[in-house]
């Protein structure tokens, strides 16, 4: 995704323990597919921490620092498709579609809770609403489906 022009500007952060990389987070650009002009918005994907370093707050530190850097860049809104109990601890609201932010691909109703949003700019939720489109690399159906949704 780092070579995908539609992902820019992006934020990529690594967490280290001495010289060993133990965690990574990436935020890439997203757009409203149904609008000619979109505010600067991003999606968090992926976040990974090596298993032996999990449950130590490393993922949370990466999220907080990433959101801080995005806010400084002028990003207005950040999305994530993830764990419904983890990401709300860092300010994400579940059911982003109910707030007017539709995911890139349709989701089963029971999965809508995992599509989340967090306004980080001064306009908050007034930034606009619409169908979210990810950078080209992430905007593939296989990234937005699971086995159950295919049945």
Each PLM stretch: what is its role?
Residues 1-31:
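Active-site rim helix/loop that mediates acceptor-substrate recognition in acyltransferases
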Residues 14, 26, 43, 48, ...:
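Conserved beta-strand segments that form the floor/walls of ligand-binding pockets within enzyme
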Residues 18-19, 52, 119-124:
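Short loop segments at secondary-structure junctions
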Residues 27-28, 62-66, 96-102:
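Short acidic (Asp/Glu) patches
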Residues 31-44, 54:
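A conserved beta-turn-beta hairpin within the catalytic core of GNAT-like acetyltransferases
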Residues 44, 49, 55-68, 79-80:
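Conserved acetyl-CoA-binding loop-helix of GNAT-fold acetyltransferases
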Residues 72-76, 82-109:
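Conserved active-site alpha-helix within GNAT-family acetyltransferase domains
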Residues 103-150:
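C-terminal "cap" of GNAT-fold acetyltransferases
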């Amino acid at each position: 995704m780092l070579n995908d022009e539609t992902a820019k500007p992006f934020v990529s952060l690594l967490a280290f323990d001495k010289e060993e990389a133990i965690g990574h987070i990436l935020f890439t650009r997203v757009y409203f597919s149904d609008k000619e002009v979109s505010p600067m918005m991003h999606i968090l994907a992926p976040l990974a921490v090596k298993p032996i370093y999990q449950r130590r707050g490393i993922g949370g530190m990466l999220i907080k620092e990433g959101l801080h850097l995005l806010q400084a860049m002028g990003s207005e809104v950040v999305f994530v498709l993830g764990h419904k109990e983890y990401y709300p601890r860092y300010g994400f609201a579940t059911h982003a579609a109910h707030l007017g932010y539709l995911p890139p691909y349709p989701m089963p109703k029971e999965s809508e809770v995992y599509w989340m949003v967090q306004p980080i700019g001064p306009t908050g939720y007034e930034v606009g609403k619409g169908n979210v489109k990810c950078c080209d690399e992430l905007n593939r159906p296989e990234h937005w489906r699971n086995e159950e949704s295919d049945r």
